[in-house]
Curated annotation (Swiss-Prot):
Signal peptide range in chain numbering: none
One function term, GO molecular function aspect: dihydroorotate dehydrogenase (quinone) activity
Protein name (record): Dihydroorotate dehydrogenase (quinone)
High-level lineage: Bacteria, Pseudomonadati, Pseudomonadota, Betaproteobacteria, Nitrosomonadales
Binding positions for FMN per the UniProt entry: 61-65, 85, 138, 171, 216, 244, 267, 296, 317-318
Catalysed conversion reaction: (S)-dihydroorotate + a quinone = orotate + a quinol
Entry EC no(s): 1.3.5.2
Bilayer topology annotation: Peripheral membrane protein
Subcellular location: Cell membrane
Manner of cofactor binding, per the entry note: Binds 1 FMN per subunit.
Family: Belongs to the dihydroorotate dehydrogenase family. Type 2 subfamily.
Length: 337
């Protein structure tokens, strides 16, 4: 109710400025004890990747890139939080403006470009937060690292976040880092997954704790590509797959203001494509590993549809922009029914 009153003011601001203001406001409200005053929704606990989740509704990566807002976000009732994408070295991302709303379609286009303050800063924030819930950390490569050396960046991040994450997501599907999606192709993906699984095994022995690895993929894949990725995930023993990232397609928003901005489209317009990928993955994986469904969840029924398509967990991001924090409770309650 409250969000519906303040949303017009937020939408009158530049999208990225509104994003920052909202997170700052959430932090202040949490410190004042104003977040989470309502009783939390009674969620249905689930076990996925060997991890116990208090409920199946998580925050998708991208909202809190540096892990600087964990306490405020945790108070909203999520079953888990995923922060990042983080890279080995700080980088500013793409020039502004780089975040655009499409209110008529309940969509968002972003070309942020993995802007973040670097993995060392993220780790410091996580430690300082004292957050004890289920935390996923999403890792990527720096813009100026060629694809031939991409594994070096992912391994550098994995080394540093391993001790602080309950699971780690390898992001090879953002459309906003040039040529990144080429890492989804057979030979490149095979080599990357081999390197990551080897390092995961070494780190598990070093830390005495196994931290699952998830791979985040794009919605802009045909069935043959999805089948090939599924086969590689199973062959390498990857622990989960996140479907999906944003889309470069514009069919669902053609003719709308901002529709021609470059970048990845999220929100309601990606819902069907994302669910299609979840369903196709489920068919090819046959339960071999869990799917985390993300893309276009703006209601409890949308969350339920992702689960029905084959997902074990869901994540929210753009839906929070359009529906507010009450969406978390709605989804948690719907999935508990």
């Amino acid at each position: 109710m409250l969000y519906s009153l303040i949303r017009p003011a937020l939408f009158s601001l530049d999208a990225e400025d509104a994003h920052g203001l909202t997170l700052t406001g959430l932090d202040v409200a949490q410190r004042l004890g104003l977040v989470g005053l309502q009783p939390r929704a009674t969620g249905k606990p689930v076990q996925v990747m060997g991890i116990d989740f208090p409920n199946a509704v998580g925050l998708a990566a991208g909202l809190d890139k540096d892990g600087a807002h964990l306490k405020g976000l945790a108070a909203l009732g999520f079953g888990f939080l995923e922060i990042g994408t983080v890279t080995p070295r700080p980088q500013p991302g793409n020039p502004k403006p780089r975040l655009f709303r499409l209110p008529a379609a309940e969509g968002i286009i972003n070309r942020m470009g993995f802007n973040n303050l670097g993995v060392d800063n993220l780790v410091r924030n996580v430690v300082a937060s004292g957050y004890t819930g289920v935390l996923g950390i999403n890792i990527g490569k720096n813009k100026d690292t060629p694809n031939e050396r991409a594994a070096d960046d992912y391994l550098a991040c994995l080394d540093k976040v391993y001790a602080h994450a309950r699971y780690v997501t390898v992001n090879i599907s953002s459309p906003n880092t040039q040529n990144l999606r080429e890492l989804q192709q057979d030979e490149a993906l095979d080599a990357l997954l081999s390197a990551i699984k080897l390092r995961q095994s070494e780190l598990a022995q070093q830390h005495g704790r196994y931290v699952p690895i998830a791979l985040k993929i794009a919605p802009d894949l045909d069935e043959a590509q999805i089948a090939a990725i599924a086969a590689l995930l199973m062959r390498h023993g990857i622990d989960a797959v996140i479907a999906t990232n944003t889309t470069i397609a514009r069919d669902a928003v053609a003719g709308l203001p901002n529709a021609n901005e470059s970048g990845g489209l999220s929100g309601a317009p990606v819902r069907e494509a994302s669910t299609r990928v979840v369903r196709t993955l489920a068919q090819h994986l046959g339960g071999a590993l869990p799917i985390i469904g993300v893309g276009g969840i703006l209601s409890g029924d949308d969350a339920r549809a992702k689960i029905a398509a084959g997902a074990s967990l869901v994540q929210l991001y753009s839906g929070l922009i359009y529906r507010g924090p009450g969406l978390v409770r709605e989804c948690v309650e719907r999935l508990a029914q």
